[in-house]
């Protein structure tokens, strides 16, 4: 049985503020297949605070840096494809072949979509030929 009781906040695994757990039930066996921690408002506040802090530097990353990070994430996802399929199969009670062939692909498809959007996205729009120096810049706003 899987036991995942810590949260990844601010670049490290941390112990939740409260010891409240949930047994994840596999619908196909009706048995507990994992134990996870339930977050408190303190955990949520810590995560949001960390995200806001991370945004300060993330907002200044270039398109190329973001593409490189997303490509690394996609590569890692593909390497751990079978682990994803096993986790999905346990949680949803789906046959492993179905999880491996279809459901695990959903996460990979999302990452590929983000890559395509980022590659094609125009962060700068010239308002017209008559005023080539007049531009609209699209910049990150926040978390």
Model-predicted regions and their roles:
Residues 1-133:
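N-terminal Rossmann-like NAD(P)+-binding subdomain of aldehyde/semialdehyde dehydrogenases
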